Amino acid sequence: MSRKPIIAGNWKMNKTAAEAREFIDAVKNNIPSNNLVDTVIGSPALFLEGMKKGVKGTELQVAAQNCYWEDFGAFTGETSPAALAALGVDYVIIGHSERRDYFHETDQEINKKAHAIFKHKMTPILCCGESLETYEAGKTAEWIEGQITADLKGLSAEQVSSMVIAYEPIWAIGTGKSADANIADDICGVVRATVEKLYGKEVAQAVRIQYGGSVKPENVAEYMAKENVDGALVGGASLQADSFLALLDFVK
């Protein structure tokens, strides 16, 4: 099965509203056709409304970096999935290692977020990944299988087929280190095998799996050439318009 590539930038807690507008203006009319690749920017919640207005009429898509699992209520500081959907947000990143580590998010909470995102007809980008200790102990496959199984609990085959799963080795995020393309392909293969075990081969062949971890314009093509890697979730290299556009050169 041919899966359309997806390149998603994750700005994390960076940029002002003016800088976000400047980036969008530089990028939105210079990306490849979405017949070839889905191009997504994950923005801080503050800028999402402006981002959606800025990309209107173009093929650049917008992701939120997080949401809560309840639509509305007394949840100070949280972001409503219903409100994101009303803005027209396309994707929501959930389960990022920084959310799991710094904010102690659990697989059970991430699972509730996935259900909420699908309820509002957005697409989750579900992150999974292991620590250096787990990797060096040879327990990566076991760890990833446990995360994926818990995070997908109760989702339908149709939902899982349409979502994006991002493998991000924690030891490679923002460190300048990266899992080489063969390791990334192997672990993305573990993700796919776990989905197959849970949902069957057809779903496993449909779900798109990204690699995230110090992806740069210089190495993105090497990852994208691998059988189980369908895209990249990119942090630092997505912050500047020129480097973000260079990430998309692999489709040429």
From Swiss-Prot:
The enzyme class is isomerase
What is the protein's name according to its record? Triosephosphate isomerase
Subunit annotation: Homodimer.
- Please provide an example of a Pfam family that matches this protein in its UniProt record: TIM
> Is S-adenosyl-L-methionine included in the keywords of this UniProt record?
no
Q: Does the keyword Cytoplasm apply?
A: yes
Chain's role: Involved in the gluconeogenesis. Catalyzes stereospecifically the conversion of dihydroxyacetone phosphate (DHAP) to D-glyceraldehyde-3-phosphate (G3P).
Under which pathway is this protein filed? Carbohydrate biosynthesis; gluconeogenesis; Carbohydrate degradation; glycolysis; D-glyceraldehyde 3-phosphate from glycerone phosphate: step 1/1
- Listed EC numbers: 5.3.1.1
Q: Which keywords accompany this UniProt record?
A: Cytoplasm, Gluconeogenesis, Glycolysis, Isomerase
Q: Which residues bind substrate per the record?
A: N10, W11, K12, G174, S214, G235, G236
Primary site of residence: cytoplasm
- According to its UniProt record, which reaction does this protein catalyse? D-glyceraldehyde 3-phosphate = dihydroxyacetone phosphate
Lineage at the top is: Bacteria, Bacillati, Bacillota, Bacilli, Lactobacillales
